Amino acid sequence: MMKLKAIWFAVLSAAVFFSGMPSRAENPVKASPDKFSLAVECVKRFEGWHGEKKHWPYVGWGHKVLPGERFTNGITKAQGDSILRADLRKLCRMFSYLGRDSLLAAVLSYNVGPYRLKGYGKRPKSRLLKKLESGDRNIYKEYVSFRCYKGKVVPSIERRRKVEFMLFFEE
């Protein structure tokens, strides 16, 4: 009987003390739709519109057409916007275990690809993701390090990373 009372006390006290604490895998899309909309606008600003044949296989705001998808370069901006939102939601779900950093990882992986962060085959997991998973929040250097193309630093990509970090990293 005494053990039962102790268990009930522990459960009730946990419910009272931890009820206001957000869970680690909180959905950033539901928690702050304004941050998600800001992420959409940020991606639009830096990606630009891919509406010409020279941009193929990219359409809309940088969506890569996958096998089986029937998109053309003639899609409307509204269609491009909904495709972008769907892609970002999918990436947020992919990184949802990071909690408040899932939107930051989703915005980065929209540009560089999720497997540059997560690793795949012979490609190792990124230092950025390793740090976030271990709880280390000192990630500025690792985040901005995704600024190279063919081994060379691209100033516009570096600017993009700094803006994304400033907008979506929460202390």
State each model region's role.
Residues 55-59, 63:
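Early exported N-terminus immediately downstream of N-terminal targeting peptides
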Residues 1-8:
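Bacterial N-terminal signal peptides that target proteins for export
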Residues 10-17:
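Bacterial N-terminal signal peptides
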Residues 95-101:
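Structural motif
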Residues 102-116:
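Short N-proximal segments of mature Sec-exported proteins
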Residues 18-50, 63-67, 75-94, 115-171:
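Long, amphipathic alpha-helical surface segments
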Residues 38, 54-56, 100:
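Extracytoplasmic
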